[in-house]
Structures are given as structure tokens and as C-alpha cells.
Design a protein with these regions (language model features):
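C-terminal structured domain segments across diverse proteins
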Residues: 112-115, 149, 171
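Aromatic-lined ligand-binding clefts that engage carbohydrates, nucleic acids, or primary amines
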Residues: 109
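Extended active-site neighborhood of metal-dependent phosphoesterases/phosphodiesterases
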Residues: 1-106, 120-127, 131-143, 151-197, ...
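Short beta-strand and adjacent tight-turn residues that come in two discontinuous sequence segments
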Residues: 146
């Protein structure tokens, strides 16, 4: 991380989330890296922060998605920390944060997608749709950003105003094709930039 993302303009705060690869190892070490790297800003497994610029406010809620899926919780040999997490506590926290959020824009970010075109196990997304998506829809979240699939997908689902974004990969990009609700998809590696004013959230 430090060697790859070494450009001077990248010497800014980074706000990570835990993913499936972190859950294969020592997840606490990922949090502890906050005390070693000035850029690495991860105060907890899930956390939130509000930003303001030129009168526009954004709240970002970073969440821990691996414990939301039975696949990880039921495989303690491979993902030893997943079953130890209090899932209901996190879901209640997300609901509480979104209930009190008053910012112009609300973005939730986690590792795993709620909707995506992928060859990965369908149960992952079904668990996310069952446990997380109803909370996001209830609070009319503007955007859910994730990774995991190693390509870019922008999805809008019927009955929801949420923009579901699968962010592209920094490496190991995978092929992708449209699925239900696809607005745009692309297999190229890269990064996304989000900007906002009072009227528009732009990706």
C-alpha cells in the first residue's frame, strides 16, 4: 500500500473498509495500522464522518459487510473473525446513524455488493439484499459504493432511487456484462471520483 500509492497527491486521508481477504487473516491488524500510517484512517470496523465544502454536506458511512453474509459466518476455519462480530449491533448502528443524518448527500460504503453481475456465489448478494438493502432504502440513501467484483458497475434497481456502484479494481480487472438495472459497466481497472454540490452528486 505505502509503496504503490506513493504519489505526493495521494498523501491524504484514506478511509478503508474490511473485505473478504482481510477476514482471512488478522482483521484487528488492519485497524491497528491507523496508529502506524498517518494516511490510514480506520477508527473502527464501521464508522461515519460528515464532510462540508462550500456549503454542501456529505455523510459517508463505512460498514463491515463480511459478517452480514452466512457464507463467511459459517466458515470459521477460513474467516475466523466473521462469526465473532455482533451483526445486529452493526445493523442497528447503521439504522441509527442514517436516522439522524441531515446532510445533503448520504453515501454508504462497504466491500461487498448488494447487486452486481458476477460469477460469485449468489448467496452473498441475497444476504446483503435481505439484511442491508432494506435499511438503505428506508433512509433513502443516495449511493452505495462497494468493490469485491474487480470491475465497474452502476446499477439502478426498480423501486429504488439508490445508485448502486461497484467500484473498479486497481488491478486484476474482470470481465463484466449488463444485468438487471445496469446503467453502465466496464471491465477496465481504475478509480472513481465523486463530487457534489447542493443539486447534484456526480460520479
Amino acid at each position: 500500500y505505502e509503496l504503490i500509492y506513493s504519489h505526493p497527491e495521494l498523501m491524504i486521508d484514506w478511509f478503508p473498509v474490511l473485505g473478504n481477504h482481510e477476514y482471512r487473516g488478522n482483521t484487528q491488524a488492519v485497524l491497528d495500522y491507523t496508529s502506524i500510517s498517518r494516511r490510514w484512517t480506520m477508527p473502527a470496523r464501521y464508522y461515519t464522518k460528515a464532510f462540508e465544502d462550500k456549503g454542501t454536506t456529505i455523510r459517508i458511512v463505512w460498514i463491515d459487510t463480511a459478517p452480514m453474509m452466512d457464507k463467511y459466518r459459517n466458515d470459521s476455519a477460513t474467516y475466523p473473525d466473521a462469526c465473532k462480530q455482533d451483526l445486529q449491533k452493526q445493523l442497528s448502528w447503521i439504522d441509527s446513524v442514517l436516522t439522524s443524518a441531515k446532510e445533503d448527500w448520504i453515501i454508504v460504503a462497504g466491500h461487498h455488493p448488494i447487486y452486481a453481475e458476477t460469477s460469485k456465489d449468489d448467496s452473498e448478494r441475497l444476504d446483503m439484499q435481505k439484511r442491508l438493502d432494506p435499511i438503505l432504502r428506508k433512509h433513502k440513501v443516495d449511493m452505495y459504493i462497494c468493490g469485491h467484483i474487480h470491475n465497474f458497475q452502476h446499477i439502478r434497481r426498480p423501486g429504488s432511487d439508490i445508485d448502486y456502484i461497484v467500484n473498479s479494481a486497481g488491478s486484476l480487472a474482470r470481465k463484466v456484462k449488463p444485468t438487471e438495472g445496469t446503467v453502465f459497466c466496464n471491465p477496465e481497472p481504475g478509480f472513481s471520483v465523486v463530487s457534489a454540490d447542493k443539486k447534484e452528486l456526480t460520479l
